[in-house]
Regions:
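Conserved small/polar residues in nucleotide/adenosyl-binding loops
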Residues: 146-148
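Positively charged n-region of N-terminal signal peptides that target proteins for export
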Residues: 1-4
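Sec-dependent N-terminal signal peptides
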Residues: 6-8
């Protein structure tokens, strides 16, 4: 397995329903272990498993949370439209929130997509919502360092 470090600029905007409804806008950075099968000419299959720390406005359920995501995508001529995955958000109050996501983008540049909040634990057991996420790739100083 090839290990690559990712820095994630992750923006999430979502409406979620609890006793109330609202929006959140979180950002963060993290690192991912990546498996890559390179077919040449911008054709690759990629799977990843990683963690990130997030921040949001003070008092938001996602402020000072961490997330663990597992997903994958297939690049064809340097572009992808099939990214899928799932994330667990570990909240400061000890609870968890789960999302599924789909995305598209360009290898080495970034991507965006939609996500669905599929549930949580404890007081967030019935949480639901949808939203949009995006990431921007940054250039690393070495070939083994990739930033997204």
């Amino acid at each position: 397995m090839k290990k690559i470090i990712f820095v994630l600029i992750f923006a999430l905007v979502s409406a979620h329903s609890l006793a109330d409804s609202g929006k959140f806008n979180a950002s963060g950075a993290g690192s991912w272990a990546v498996n890559v099968m390179d077919g040449g000419n911008g054709n690759m299959s990629i799977t990843y498993d990683g963690n990130a720390g997030l921040s949001d406005k003070e008092g938001s359920i996602f402020d000072k949370s961490t997330m663990h995501c597992i997903g994958g995508l297939t690049l064809v001529a340097g572009k992808f439209d099939d990214e899928t995955g799932m994330c667990t958000f570990y909240l400061m109050d000890g609870e968890k929130v789960f999302i599924n996501y789909k995305g598209k983008g360009t290898g080495g540049q970034g991507g965006s997509g939609d996500f669905v909040i599929v549930g949580g634990t404890g007081k967030y057991e019935k949480i639901s919502g949808t939203g949009f996420s995006s990431r921007q790739n940054l250039k690393g100083k070495s070939l083994s360092l990739i930033h997204i």
